[in-house]
């Protein structure tokens, strides 16, 4: 398994909860199509084992243990926390929202993306078994909070947002009229409503255009999906 090279052993040892399940995002296939090194959403060490000496699950113990803060509990923040904790550091994860998982949790609620919650599920299970990790929700972090905590290092993993500026892979100038009633992907995921027929212009060429189209259609909207 690309997502978990130790899948057979974990099944044999009845460690099902430790399996990093494939989420079916096909970024591995996309890597091959674009002739770039293999990538995997669940296994960031893939294709780097020999080049960088990265192991999928074993992290060398740090010579000096530190108190560390990870601001943000999305996929990147949880992965950073897990690697740092496995190295033996004391890790605090602070998430400003009421849920841990960030983008993977939000997008897993869209039609067809339920498996994407596995990105957070695997990491949260591992972190919750570790005595050197604290997880906090409803905890927005700013410079003053970092100073008060007196940690050795802070890792900022506060995420990104889908653009809503009319630009895309093939559009280097804004699409004319995009500002008239346009909604960002983030707004739609968070429940924003749009009256009347909806046109989705997909200049990402991956998954989100199709997913948002299906999501809005299931809500009863008249949807037209357009690609370059």
Task: Indicate residue ranges for each PLM-predicted region.
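Flavin-dependent oxidoreductase catalytic cores
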Residues: 1-71, 75, 80-91, 99, ...
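Repeat-solenoid scaffold signature
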Residues: 1-13, 123-138, 144-145
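Rossmann-like dinucleotide/flavin-binding elements
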Residues: 62-93, 135-147, 158-171, 179-228
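Glycine-rich phosphate-binding loop signature in dinucleotide/nucleotide-binding domains
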Residues: 148-152
């Amino acid at each position: 398994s690309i997502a978990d090279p130790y899948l057979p052993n974990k099944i044999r040892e009845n460690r099902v909860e430790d399996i990093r399940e494939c989420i079916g995002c096909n970024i591995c296939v996309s890597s091959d199509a674009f002739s770039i090194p293999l990538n995997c959403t669940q296994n960031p060490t893939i294709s780097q084992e020999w080049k960088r000496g990265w192991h999928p699950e074993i992290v060398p113990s740090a010579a000096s243990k530190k108190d560390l803060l990870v601001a943000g509990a999305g996929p990147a923040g949880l992965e950073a926390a897990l690697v740092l904790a496995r190295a033996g550091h004391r890790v605090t994860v602070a998430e400003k929202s009421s849920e841990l998982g960030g983008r993977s949790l939000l997008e897993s609620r869209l039609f067809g993306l339920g498996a994407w919650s596995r990105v957070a599920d695997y990491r949260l299970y591992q972190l919750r078994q570790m005595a050197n990790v604290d997880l906090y929700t409803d905890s927005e972090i700013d410079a003053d909070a970092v100073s008060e905590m007196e940690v050795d290092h802070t890792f900022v993993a506060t995420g990104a947002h889908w653009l809503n500026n009319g630009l895309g892979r093939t559009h280097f100038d804004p699409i004319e009229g995009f500002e008239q009633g346009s909604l960002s992907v983030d707004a739609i995921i968070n429940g924003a409503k749009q009256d009347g027929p909806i046109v989705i212009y997909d200049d990402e060429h991956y998954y989100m255009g199709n997913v948002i189209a299906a999501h809005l259609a299931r809500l009863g909207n008249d949807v037209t999906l357009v690609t370059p």
